[in-house]
Amino acid sequence: KLVMEGISANSTAFLEETTPEEKPKAISAEQIEIKKDLLYDKYTLEDTYPYKDTTRSFQWDKIKERLALLENIQQTPSQWGILQNYKNRNGEAPLVRHYKRNAYKRIADTLGIERYQSVPLYLLTDTLVPERYGEDGSLVRFLADGENFVKVSPIYIGEEWYVPKRYVKVLPDTTHFIKTIMIDRRDQNIMTLEQTGEAQWTVRSMNPATTGRHRPPYAQETPLGIFVLQEKKTRMIFLKDGSTATGGFAPYASRFSDGGYIHGVPVNEPRKALIEYSPSLGTTPRSHMCVRNATSHSKFIFDWAPVNETIIFVLE
């Protein structure tokens, strides 16, 4: 085009030389190299392992896709943020344009994301009525600040949205994600990895886990998505279903979305002593939304994974 407009090829070369640095080349899933150097080595699963009359596995192709994504989104300097509305602490999200009542008799958007604990996402052309809900804990790229709204791009669902300021926690400029936890709903397993170089990742643990099950009105599935580790509790107290009475506690709990935690084997009242392992781990979904682990593995994650700097991928 420049040549056609009468600018010489030499001038173009000069222009090309002085333009800002070229965009870094995207890393493909095929380029990702994974080695194993376990920091936690109890109940370790093989890459493929027997389960009842079938086999289960760690889905390396999907894991590599997500690791490549995590590297690629960080190639250009970005301000990162987290969508936050745990227990509606930042205010109940307004009603979306089109909504329904789900199996739990709660309001949800047309994609099934519940209003409770979620964040309203507004189209860039309409800040009066939200279009859909964003899940608590979701990783977003922070694009622009405003008086009442900020512009963000959630990494999992994509596109650009306006969100009222109070629902977005902005992370420090220095934030860099090199630790990640992969939770597999299909095969009921969990893996921790950390980055050791460009396109190079090291597995730190690979273990059985149990995710949330769809069982209204109390138990629900662990949400799929890309989340940031938000907080930790040495003991997460839980209530008996449908009651305000304490049901017990889950040890070494690391929260990533809504009331979803990665935690150890639950301890029911009146017992107080920790339970290390349960034979149900790695079998079928059975928790309320949380990701249940051997208690020593949940403690490993609790100690190893920094808050606001660890990415949790929930995949299927």
Predicted segments — roles?
Residues 14, 20-93, 131-166:
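SH3/SH3-like beta-barrel superfamily modules
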Residues 26-34, 38-40, 45-46, 51-53, ...:
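Exported/periplasmic cell-wall-interacting domains
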Residues 93-117, 268, 272-283:
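Short beta-strand/loop turn elements enriched in aromatics
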Residues 115-126, 288-295:
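Short, structured beta-strand/loop micro-motifs enriched in basic residues and often containing a Trp
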Residues 124-134, 202:
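SH3/SH3-like (including bacterial SH3b) beta-barrel domains
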Residues 135-138, 188, 296-303:
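Solvent-exposed, polar/charged alpha-helical surfaces in well-ordered, non-transmembrane soluble domains
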Residues 136, 223-224, 307-308:
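Short, flexible surface segments
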Residues 164-273:
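Gly/Pro-biased beta-strand-loop elements
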